A protein has these predicted regions:
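Cytosolic, long alpha-helical scaffolding segments
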Residues: 2-128
């Protein structure tokens, strides 16, 4: 549309009123859950064979991915007029998945902070 010689972007009110793709939030939740599993497996691997620089970088990347996933979910929630679940429930699930990933990553990084070179049987059991 051209107004006063300027191209104006089309505004589609229906895209704001209609719900997003049916499975969008569930897909975002699935991706976050898979990231939690990936981070937990990395923690297990670290407990079994030690924390290396490469594994530390992987943990930091996983932590960053979790943050990005949370932001994407909340951004989509803020854009959506109609949602498949209650807004509070979507936010709660997204934040909990983020916190799970963050805590696992923090546990991995704390191995270095506290200079733990040997891992107890309890730590190994927790990791398995």
């Amino acid at each position: 549309m051209v107004i006063g010689g300027h191209n104006m972007p089309k505004f589609n009110l229906m895209s704001y009123i209609m719900p997003p793709e049916d499975k969008m939030f569930f897909t975002l939740f699935q991706n976050s859950a898979e990231l939690c599993i990936e981070t937990a497996r990395l923690y297990t691997h670290i407990i079994e064979s030690g924390l290396t620089t490469e594994k530390k970088e992987q943990i930091l990347k996983a932590k960053k991915k979790g943050s990005i996933s949370l932001k994407l979910t909340l951004k989509q929630l803020n854009k959506s007029f109609i949602t498949p679940l209650e807004r509070e429930d979507i936010q709660y699930i997204a934040v909990r998945l983020y916190k799970i990933n963050k805590r696992i990553a923090k546990a991995c990084l704390n191995l270095e902070v506290y200079r733990l070179l040997k891992y107890t049987e309890e730590m190994k059991e927790q990791a398995s």
